[in-house]
């Protein structure tokens, strides 16, 4: 059976070339509506559905997807594509508005009434902020957004009060991970109000040496200041990763090549494999490609990291386990 993994990938991810370290960037804006209790305090589901209707009316050009009308597998696919958060699934009256290429989404009734997301691979944080801000302006023309002249935008979580903005960059950091530098880096940037998390944000697991770097606080700084400082933090981490890769290539080349080719051999020959192992093997193969140890046609790290997740493997109508299907996809696409 041939597996067309491209059907499971958002258009914005497919249309851009991959880079050695930066995988994607995201801007998220949290907003709430005046005269509505917050989502976690709804008395009935109807409170939530009223908010959904109001937000949908304000953004008529987006496609609405109500989570109560979707099965669990479809919801988890949207989590895997970063269109919604795992927390949104837990809400009884939740929805998401999505644009054509899925680079823009608006979650409704997560922790806050509205969470605007703009995502891209080769787009700067400032450009993404401009896109998210445009949606914010459109909402503001139709809805009464909670705002305080002294504090800024009012949010459910105190750490989001102010700009209500979380900026984040997803980085592939195999060198720093292999050399066990990530804990020290996380401690360092934490002192400046920035944090490193797993692939799906707070409390999520790290897969394939992939980390999300983002700001922690939004009060007392402008959107531009947050973006500029995060960009400096990310550039320093990228610099450190490049230095480590150079050292691995110069002083530990045989060991690094052995690691890369072992992972390549496993991915090309495995008959069953877990998500955790597959992600780390893919990461090491990508490292080998970036260091010019190997050349693979059409190797797409970002796309494969999405396509091998369980929600996309449960579609197949056969008796194979998820681990077997994952191995089939990897053998087929890594040649």
Swiss-Prot record:
Record-linked PROSITE patterns = PHOSPHAGEN_KINASE, PHOSPHAGEN_KINASE_C
Name of one Pfam family that matches: ATP-gua_Ptrans
Give a yes or no for keyword Transferase in this entry.
yes
**Which reactions does this protein catalyse?**
L-arginyl-[protein] + ATP = N(omega)-phospho-L-arginyl-[protein] + ADP + H(+)
Q: One of this protein's GO BP terms? A: phosphocreatine biosynthetic process
Where the record annotates domain Phosphagen kinase C-terminal, the positions are 21-244
- Indicate yes or no for the key word Transferase: yes
Q: What is the annotated role of this protein in its UniProt record?
A: Catalyzes the specific phosphorylation of arginine residues in proteins.
This chain's protein is named: Protein-arginine kinase
């Amino acid at each position: 059976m041939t597996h067309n993994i491209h059907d499971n990938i958002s258009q914005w991810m497919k249309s851009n070339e991959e880079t050695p370290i930066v995988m994607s960037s995201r801007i998220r804006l949290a907003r709430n509506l005046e005269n509505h209790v917050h989502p976690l305090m709804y008395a009935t589901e109807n409170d939530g559905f009223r908010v959904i209707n109001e937000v949908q009316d304000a953004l008529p050009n987006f496609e609405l997807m109500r989570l109560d009308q979707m099965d669990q597998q479809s919801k988890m696919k949207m989590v895997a594509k970063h269109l919604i958060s795992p927390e949104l699934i837990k809400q009884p009256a939740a929805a998401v508005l999505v644009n054509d290429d899925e680079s823009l989404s608006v979650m409704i009734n997560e922790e806050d009434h509205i969470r605007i997301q703009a995502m891209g691979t080769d787009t700067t944080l400032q450009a993404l902020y401009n896109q998210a801000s445009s949606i914010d302006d459109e909402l503001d023309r139709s809805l009464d957004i909670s705002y305080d002249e002294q504090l800024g935008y009012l949010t459910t979580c105190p750490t989001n009060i102010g700009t209500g903005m979380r900026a984040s960059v997803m980085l592939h950091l195999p060198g720093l991970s292999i050399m066990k530098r990530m804990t020290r880096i996380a401690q360092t940037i934490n002192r400046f109000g920035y944090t490193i998390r797993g692939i799906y944000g707070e409390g999520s697991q790290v897969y394939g040496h992939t980390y999300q770097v983002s700001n922690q606080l939004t009060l007392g700084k402008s959107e531009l200041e947050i973006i500029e400082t995060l960009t400096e933090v990310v550039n320093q981490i990228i610099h450190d990763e490049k230095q480590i890769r150079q050292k691995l290539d110069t002083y530990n080349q045989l060991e690094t090549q052995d690691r890369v080719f072992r992972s390549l051999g496993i991915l090309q020959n495995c008959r069953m494999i877990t998500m955790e192992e597959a992600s780390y093997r893919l990461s090491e193969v990508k490292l080998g490609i970036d260091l010019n140890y190997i050349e693979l046609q059409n190797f797409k790290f970002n796309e494969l990291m999405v396509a091998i997740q369980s929600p996309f493997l449960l579609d197949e109508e056969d008796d194979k386990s998820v681990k077997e299907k994952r191995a089939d996809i990897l053998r087929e696409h890594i040649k």
